[in-house]
Amino acid sequence: MSTAKLDDSTQRPLYGERIIEESKIICFENPNKKRIYEISIQLPEFTCKCPFSGYPDFAKLNIIYQPNLSVYELKSLKLYINNFRDIKISHEEVVNRIMDDLVNEGSPHWIHLNAAFNPRGNVSMQLDIFSGQKRN
């Protein structure tokens, strides 16, 4: 292990931290607007902090949606989700905020967000939020 001193650059945010901090959900045009189909996205490494203890909370997020005019771009979604890692926020609030942002940015016909939080203190929690009307 090196014992070299670190320079001032350790005080500035690293490039990855800057990218995450500036992230937003980006969408692109649905390549087949006439077809009804579902897209499923898994984000297994979601983290935020408990607003009471400051301890990290971990969850697996699953998004299933029927796109309308646009589709979520996956890298931007990953970076947007990573932005919550240092935020002190309740499970209920963070999942509702994510759903609001997904609906506002992508305007899907229908969307379901499931957040399965890892157990802490022998208690686990799962939230399911739906928006829109599912089409067949």
UniProtKB/Swiss-Prot annotation:
Top enzyme category: oxidoreductase
Q: Residues in the active site? A: C50, D57
Pathway entry = tRNA modification; tRNA-queuosine biosynthesis
Q: Which UniProt keywords apply?
A: Cytoplasm, NADP, Oxidoreductase, Queuosine biosynthesis
The superkingdom listed in its UniProt entry is Bacteria
Pfam families according to UniProt: QueF
BP-aspect Gene Ontology terms: queuosine biosynthetic process; tRNA modification
The primary location reported for this protein is cytoplasm
Descriptive protein name: NADPH-dependent 7-cyano-7-deazaguanine reductase
Q: What is its EC number?
A: 1.7.1.13
Give the subcellular location. Answer: Cytoplasm
Instruction: Please give the function described in this protein's UniProt entry.
Output: Catalyzes the NADPH-dependent reduction of 7-cyano-7-deazaguanine (preQ0) to 7-aminomethyl-7-deazaguanine (preQ1).
Q: Which reaction does it catalyse?
A: 7-aminomethyl-7-carbaguanine + 2 NADP(+) = 7-cyano-7-deazaguanine + 2 NADPH + 3 H(+)
GO CC annotation terms, alphabetical:
cytoplasm
Q: Which family does it belong to?
A: Belongs to the GTP cyclohydrolase I family. QueF type 1 subfamily.
